[in-house]
């Protein structure tokens, strides 16, 4: 397949260094992308302090939750749900991809790793019910639309029985948008998702596609027993990307058709062998994010700032102080006070 790109052969580490000692991301990195772990205890304070190692003083409490939990402590995208005293759900920690990046800033501050967090969870009787691993590929070992065509021709040998895909195109010119391939059912305990991250980010943030360059993302989404098995293996090997490679290789293999032999004996495609080989050599990438509540600031900028500017210009023209008066007279709710505490604190102030 001419359209499937041949992979690079010097993609070995997380960081490469330019001539001026400027560290940049490697074109191929793997990272923890989603965590959900439950504890059969109602001692939410102990879980926050001994598993997350965060000060509850910086967390906002809500008298509501998800998944049947009745309350939530949250620090932006890091969430801790708790159940009613007579409900054996106990406590649940949940971190989205952004939450994982934020939590890495606390791990970095404590000079700890994800493996330390996994170990803390296990020591407190934690049970992992969701664990996602993401691999970002900015060298693009293959074109996902062409990978889809290869799969549709029967050149993908998989333990999954079914696959799904979606995509888009512009009706005015026929130019295609991003393509996503799902291997396995979203309802199953394990499935893979390969998609063109550059298209997703361009649409989400209204960025020209050419500014983002090539960018594929490969996500491994594990639930319940599959998630727990992966964590147990990680604690033994301390090698997240080896586990990722084994999971991908266990479920999906792209091959080159050969009418002279049976399908199960078709040779693995060179691009796929090289991709799997390089993934197996990747260390875990950590990208701590120290900006919290960015969503609130973005909302203020996009939704409120134009109105505030209008009132400010009217004040300046009319000699009034309406805007400054409104700000001075505004009452901060508890959640705003907590957010302000987080804005003004150093990361080290929030860990215990």
From Swiss-Prot:
It comes from Bacillus subtilis (strain 168). GO terms for biological process: DNA integration. This is Putative DNA relaxase NicK. The keyword Nucleotide-binding does not apply. It holds the Pfam family Rep_trans. The oriT nick site is located within the nicK open reading frame. Belongs to the plasmid replication initiation factor family. InterPro entries: REP-like_C, Rol_Rep_N. The keyword Manganese does not apply. Probable DNA relaxase involved in the transfer of the integrative and conjugative element ICEBs1. Required for the transfer of ICEBs1. Probably mediates conjugation of ICEBs1 by nicking at oriT on the conjugative element and facilitates the translocation of a single strand of ICEBs1 DNA through a transmembrane conjugation pore into the recipient cell. Keywords: Conjugation, DNA integration.
